[in-house]
């Protein structure tokens, strides 16, 4: 009984190690110097070095001003787009996507038709064909 438990514990440890090792990305796997030298396709000197520079107060202020200018220009552009007032629909018709229960008049759009659902409890004007 103790031998089987020891064997199962060893198998469990091996599986845990194998699972953890197989999920490491290729660049995080352990390598020795010989494998780095022999692998000519990956040369660490080919990659450019990364330099980190701290921003001074002046550059921070400039970037803030640029961000504020972008925000204000977006607000101005949105304010310039004024919604056109809709033309009032004539009384004897129903607008698209509005309720059109049977006592109501026909739909205003010639391509739309009145569709009812749920035993004619919810009816609305809908456009069926895009080519119309």
From Swiss-Prot:
It is found in: Secreted. InterPro entries: Agouti, Agouti_dom, Agouti_dom_sf. GO terms for molecular function: melanocortin receptor binding; neuropeptide hormone activity; type 3 melanocortin receptor binding; type 4 melanocortin receptor binding. Residues 93-132 form the Agouti domain. Disulfide bonds join 93-108, 100-114, 107-125, 111-132, 116-123. Glycans are attached at residue 39. PANTHER family: AGOUTI RELATED, AGOUTI-SIGNALING PROTEIN. This is Agouti-signaling protein.
């Amino acid at each position: 009984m103790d031998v089987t438990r020891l064997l199962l514990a060893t198998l469990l440890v091996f599986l845990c190690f194998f699972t953890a090792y197989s999920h490491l990305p290729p660049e995080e796997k352990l390598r020795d110097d010989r494998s780095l030298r022999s692998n000519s396709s990956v040369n660490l000197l080919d990659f450019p070095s990364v330099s980190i520079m701290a921003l001074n107060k002046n550059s921070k202020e400039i970037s803030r001003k640029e961000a504020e200018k972008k925000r204000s220009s977006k607000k101005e552009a949105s304010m310039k787009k004024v919604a056109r007032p809709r033309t009032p629909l004539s009384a004897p018709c129903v607008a698209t996507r509005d309720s059109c229960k049977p006592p109501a008049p026909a739909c205003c759009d010639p391509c739309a038709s009145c569709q009812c659902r749920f035993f004619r409890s919810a009816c609305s004007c809908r456009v069926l064909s895009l080519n119309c």
